Amino acid sequence: MIMEAINLEKIKTQMRKGVLEMCILSIIHKKKEAYASDIMEALKEADMIVVEGTLYPLMTRLKNASLLNYSWRESTEGPPRKYYTLTDKGLSFLNEALASWNELQTMITKLI
């Protein structure tokens, strides 16, 4: 019984990881631009809790893949902030990911 619970948690974690990039890109696209705490807040509101130690390396990976750009802006609340925007490649990737997500949902719905 305990082994089943461990496997279920592992499966749930893997499913979240599998869609996290798509969710982050979607948040940035909806907001037009987003600061890291905006992204974390949106994920939290959707009950997708992500820690900074997960988010920042992922953002770097998306930037290195040319899916995101960023710019620094002064902040009245402290140090300058890094704001992210989607590149054209990022938007294309997001659209393809969303199409794949919709196909997957359709397939799963037929099975359950």
Where are these regions (language model features)?
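Basic amphipathic alpha-helical segments that dock to polyanions
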Residues: 55-57, 61-62
